[in-house]
Amino acid sequence: MCRVFTYIHTSAVRLSALGASRESTFFKSRTALIHTVNVANFHVSRQNCRRCLDASRHCFSTRSRTEERLLLQLSIPFLHQISPKPACPPSSLNSHSFECCSLTFSYSYMMVSCKLLLYYGTFSSIISIVLSCVATSPTGTVTTTVAPTTTTAATGCTSCTASQVTFAQSGGGVQIDTAGIPGTAAGCLTLTLTCTAGTGNYAFMQFNNNQGGPAENQDMGMTINALANCVDGNWVYTSGGVSRIVTQVSCNQAPNAG
């Protein structure tokens, strides 16, 4: 008995010659299929495999119908430790009983590099199936190479200038120091807006001609700092999920009651 088991696209296909019986499934496509196959539990040595192949050729060459001839060529570079099965006794080869030489291909724990070339007779046509796979081992070390990445800031966050914000005293207020301090964060430009009050006073800031100030005003400190980020060429202040473009900053102070 000659039996070969293989998996093609996750479906098991059995090619066998059992006495005078014939398989009912015929291959009619001439398409060459390339697929990755997991191969486990071969349990045959290189020498035994060679014997089985020779015996298989002999078995199928003695069939009475030429369409049931099968040529099997199997090349296995034994890259892993494989437990050899005892050699097929000559008597079994002579009697065409190849049960001990059967190969079982299954999805399991070990894969070996293999090439399996099957020519399945003249069932109306010839199908050539080529299966190739890369050797791996579940206990081996996989090396992954990661190319270095360079983060380049978008042009829109590097094109702002401090002159885009006008610092002015609020009308009727007391003159206090105002400033814009340039900086960078994650490759983008920043501008720290600063108001400093006189001794005994706390500062507060207004944006865009008294259109409201930053959340930092609640600190009621002598110095207030608010950070603006360059976004699409504009200075933007964000607080509480709300963003505003800032073009003007005015600083004020009030007596510190404490």
Curated annotation (Swiss-Prot):
It comes from the Eukaryota. This is Uncharacterized protein C30G12.4. The lineage of its organism: Eukaryota, Metazoa, Ecdysozoa, Nematoda, Chromadorea.
